[in-house]
């Protein structure tokens, strides 16, 4: 697994270093050879594949900047922060990042449960936090100055899945699942609200992430449901798809962004996911002229783009552009420059942030599982 170790820290206690880093706010960089940004994601564990794609995309952006001379006259270095998709681990990783005064900001997160506490650590250190995939509304509703989200919120994504189920699939009775964790539960909550608002019967269920047999819960679902909104991550969605026939459930699944994984979902389901639907934050990259060079470079180095890579790449470029705009290695100035960003990159649209730090013009694409991957069905904007 491609991974870059964090820089060595002094023998001082981590708490003392963190206090110094927060207190200083800026770091003298004239004598330095590099300037650092962090890439935070689950780099080990069940969500390592999408997490590693986040890191790889940030690394690619940095390599491209370095090939042009870096930023502020210095080369850029990526520091890996493995949060394992675990809130406690994420906080510890964020504390290490905040304690390193040479790290100017972070592109971080695909799990909201980890993103929320980790961003609070970096907020105290005045560090910009840009997330490519943490979609729970609470991420930005807290009003943090450092928090920036490039993906759509779950109060857009959850309803979009239900609207598609009702209007396009003509569903009238929908089973809604989540795994009990912050991100998936948030999308499921919003999906349930939308279903009730549309006069559709919504039945709620909870699965435990990582279980090897969901049939006891799946077997309680009425056989006449028209659709299944499954707000779970890709590995669990694959298992669900394989076990639905065992309990005589024939309805198609609709899932949020965490299922946009050709390997961990589609291929792991071994054909059982065929025809299911997934909403994701990125349109078909092969149809965006501005994305051609990115797609070629990324896939030439790391293989097929599967999920959060394009958004993380945008995040890294926004962060580095903010460092350039700030004109100095000052965390607070860089944080403020991120909030004022106007960036047009590989997603084919101008990215700006609203007062909360949400992307101002979110969009979602609905994909259908076909063969070993996904085919675009439609794109919806808020």
Residue ranges and their predicted role:
Residues 241-313, 374-381:
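Extracellular/periplasmic periplasmic-binding protein-like sensory domains
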Residues 91-92, 136-138, 145-248, 282-293:
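Extracellular/periplasmic Venus flytrap/periplasmic-binding protein
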Residues 297-309, 320-373:
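Segments of small-molecule ligand-sensing domains
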Residues 35-59, 81-88, 110-111, 177-185, ...:
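Extracytoplasmic "Venus flytrap"
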């Amino acid at each position: 697994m491609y991974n870059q170790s964090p820089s060595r820290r002094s023998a001082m206690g981590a708490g003392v270093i963190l206090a110094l880093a927060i207190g200083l706010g800026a770091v003298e960089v004239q004598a330095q050879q590099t300037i650092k940004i962090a890439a935070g994601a689950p780099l080990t564990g069940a969500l390592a594949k999408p997490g590693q794609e986040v890191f790889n995309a940030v690394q690619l952006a940095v390599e491209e900047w370095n090939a042009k001379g870096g930023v502020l006259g210095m080369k850029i270095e990526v520091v890996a922060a493995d949060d394992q998709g675990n809130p406690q681990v994420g906080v510890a990783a964020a504390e290490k990042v905040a304690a390193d005064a040479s790290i100017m900001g972070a592109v971080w997160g695909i799990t909201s449960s980890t993103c929320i506490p980790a961003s609070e650590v970096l907020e105290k250190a005045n560090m910009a936090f840009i997330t490519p995939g943490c979609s729970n509304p609470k991420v930005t509703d807290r009003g943090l100055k450092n928090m920036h989200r490039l993906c759509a919120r779950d109060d857009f994504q959850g309803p979009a899945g239900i609207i598609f189920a009702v209007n396009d699939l003509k569903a009238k009775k929908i089973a809604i699942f989540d795994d009990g964790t912050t991100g998936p539960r948030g999308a499921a909550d919003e999906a349930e609200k939308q279903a009730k608002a549309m006069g559709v019967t919504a039945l709620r269920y909870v699965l435990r992430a990582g279980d090897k047999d969901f049939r006891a819960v799946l077997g309680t679902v009425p056989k006449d449901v028209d659709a299944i909104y499954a707000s779970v991550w890709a590995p669990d969605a694959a298992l669900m798809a394989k076990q639905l026939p065992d309990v005589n459930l024939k309805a198609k699944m609709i899932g949020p962004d965490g299922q946009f994984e050709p390997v961990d979902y589609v291929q792991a389901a071994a054909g059982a996911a065929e025809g299911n639907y997934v909403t994701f934050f990125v349109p078909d990259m092969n149809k965006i002229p501005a994305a051609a060079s990115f797609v070629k470079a990324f896939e030439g180095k790391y293989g097929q783009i599967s999920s959060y890579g394009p958004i993380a790449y945008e995040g890294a470029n926004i962060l580095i552009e903010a460092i350039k705009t700030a004109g100095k290695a000052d965390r607070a100035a860089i944080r403020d420059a991120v909030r004022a960003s106007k960036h047009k990159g590989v997603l084919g649209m101008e990215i700006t942030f609203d007062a909360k730090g949400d992307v101002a013009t979110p969009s979602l694409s609905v994909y259908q599982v076909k063969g070993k991957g996904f085919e675009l069905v439609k794109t919806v904007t808020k």
